[in-house]
Amino acid sequence: MDEELLKRAVSIVEENIDNFEFSTDEFAQKMNMSRSNLHLKLKAITGESAIDFIRKVRFKRATELLKSGRYTVTEVSSMVGFNSSSYFATCFKKYIGCLPTEYIKKVKG
């Protein structure tokens, strides 16, 4: 059951990945549960809050897109739901540990 819930949660976030207004309220609504129930379930299964779960899915996709080499950092930031590439870069560094441009250099080696 937990695995099904996680698959559904990932699918919903991926469907809304480019929507910078996608919120935990909307996420909970699409999961057919209250925001607090979603938070509790995700916390129990993954150890993450709903917002951290959304971020994890977004940054996983961002790293995939950056690795592909087909998109600029600005394009990737928009594709994963950030309306500002500078804010994306700040969050990326906080979550991944380096700036997107540094990440691209690392993966191209």
Residues of each region from the PLM?
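Short, Lys/Arg-enriched, Trp-marked, Pro/Gly-tolerant hinge/linker segments that flank
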Residues: 1-7, 15, 29-31, 44-52, ...
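Basic, amphipathic alpha-helical hairpins
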Residues: 10-22, 42, 46, 63-72, ...
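Short coil/turn motifs that cap or connect alpha-helices
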Residues: 23, 34, 49, 72, ...
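Append "Primarily bacterial transcriptional regulators
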Residues: 25-33, 38, 42, 76-83, ...
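Residue-level detection of beta-strand scaffold positions
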Residues: 39, 55, 73, 95, ...
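Terminal helix-turn-helix DNA-binding modules in bacterial transcription factors
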Residues: 44-83, 105-109
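…primarily DNA-binding HTH/wHTH and HhH modules…
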Residues: 90-109
